[in-house]
Amino acid sequence: MGSQPTNSHFTLNEQTLCGTNISLLGNNRFIQIGNGLHMTYAPGFFGNWSRDLTIGPRFGGLNKQPIHVPPKRTETASIQVTPRSIVINRMNNIQINPTSIGNPQVTIRLPLNNFKSTTQLIQQVSLTDFFRPDIEHAGSIVLILRHPSDMIGEANTLTQAGRDPDVLLEGLRNLFNACTAPWTVGEGGGLRAYVTSLSFIAACRAEEYTDKQAADANRTAIVSAYGCSRMETRLIRFSECLRAMVQCHVFPHRFISFFGSLLEYTIQDNLCNITAVAKGPQEAARTDKTSTRRVTANIPACVFWDVDKDLHLSADGLKHVFLVFVYTQRRQREGVRLHLALSQLNEQCFGRGIGFLLGRIRAENAAWGTEGVANTHQPYNTRALPLVQLSNDPTSPRCSIGEITGVNWNLARQRLYQWTGDFRGLPTQLSCMYAAYTLIGTIPSESVRYTRRMERFGGYNVPTIWLEGVVWGGTNTWNECYY
């Protein structure tokens, strides 16, 4: 039997609590008072590690001297604990349930979410070449691309000697020739930001995923649903651009970032204006459709990665949502794939976890990442100082310490062996990079629920993962993983 109190102030004192057990439960965090006012509290309320406090004598009445307990107040339910009483303010949505007469116990249940959830929405106008909101499911992941001029500038700087940065330039030209608005080098105006979706990039790199059936179904559905004769060409050329970016060390994660989760849209001809949930609970945002007022985050099944399952970790507890790029850097076999990963590990530990799972790719990139890079051919311009050879050769130029520290030290230095390091062809941080990840949200639930089911998409059944209770909002900072 339960009752809903209407008062906004509730006090439990010693006479009320003597000989009874009272538990305040809310999302597995509680205050429990037993015989003699023996109390335990958990960090959900007081911000401390759980400990036992004896407010009164445990076995001998209320006349003995109690131990002083400083007042404590929570941020969620405004509970004040003193040596004489427990005061609960704002009693809205709090239930008091007596369990039985033989075992007197009162349970006060706090609502799981007694705070206002704020959701931040974001809008973007874009062409529909890489993303059609009328085709995608509401709640799908939307990504935003930087301008192609930024990629070309980075390619001219970061491409190693021996590799051609014009490969990326040619790939971008071919890609935008198959789009609605062709782009030329040096053009800075026009629509600067393109948006795309997680399912579109997964369709581009369908051959990279281990779940071949789900990846092929997603690609076929994308081509069929978009209904454009050049859609297959766009997917192929977008994939070639991603491979060229890896070859030139202009990694895609530096130019593709998380935008939000699709909520609403307007579309006309080849332009669309989308509204996405950028921060806050996904289910808290409402759509203008009466049939689906609330939407749940969903992704293609081929891109989903349960890292905790692969690491044999516990499936319970809060989960972090990461966006992960995985790179293969072998010459002419460059690979890119994008995952949405779930893990209870934080940002620091997550990198070590995927480094363990991607050990083979990490080793291959370190061994083969410098293929095609120009090596040095100058015999007197070596990578390392030949100290042993110079010491064993009696004819090598030498000078005393006095000459080096004297007035004419510059003349003495010119007589010595001139060495300049040349590190071309050696592995670098960029050539060894195998992954990059960023935190984009959390699932703050004790029991995380995700469901895999078949969804109708473009006339085809596509395996889809639905994530419940996602709260978007991360650092939007990419962490790069290299050997």
Swiss-Prot record:
One of its GO terms (biological process) is symbiont-mediated suppression of host apoptosis. The keyword Iron-sulfur does not apply. It is found in: Virion; Host nucleus. GO terms for cellular component: host cell nucleus; viral capsid. A motif (RIP homotypic interaction motif (RHIM)) lies at residues 24-40. GO terms for molecular function: DNA binding. Keywords: Capsid protein, Host nucleus, Host-virus interaction, Inhibition of host caspases by virus, Modulation of host cell apoptosis by virus, Virion. It comes from the Viruses. Belongs to the herpesviridae TRX1 protein family. Structural component of the T=16 icosahedral capsid. The capsid is composed of pentamers and hexamers of major capsid protein/MCP, which are linked together by heterotrimers called triplexes. These triplexes are formed by a single molecule of triplex protein 1/TRX1 and two copies of triplex protein 2/TRX2. Additionally, TRX1 is required for efficient transport of TRX2 to the nucleus, which is the site of capsid assembly. Also prevents necroptosis and extrinsic apoptosis by sequestering host ZBP1 into large, insoluble supercomplexes and impairing its ability to interact with RIPK3. Interacts with TRX2, MCP and capsid vertex component 2/CVC2. Self-assembles into homo-oligomeric amyloid fibrils. Interacts with host ZBP1; this interaction prevents host necroptosis and extrinsic apoptosis. Interacts with host RIPK3. This is Triplex capsid protein 1. It comes from Varicella-zoster virus (strain Dumas) (HHV-3). The lineage of its organism: Viruses, Duplodnaviria, Heunggongvirae, Peploviricota, Herviviricetes. The gene is TRX1.
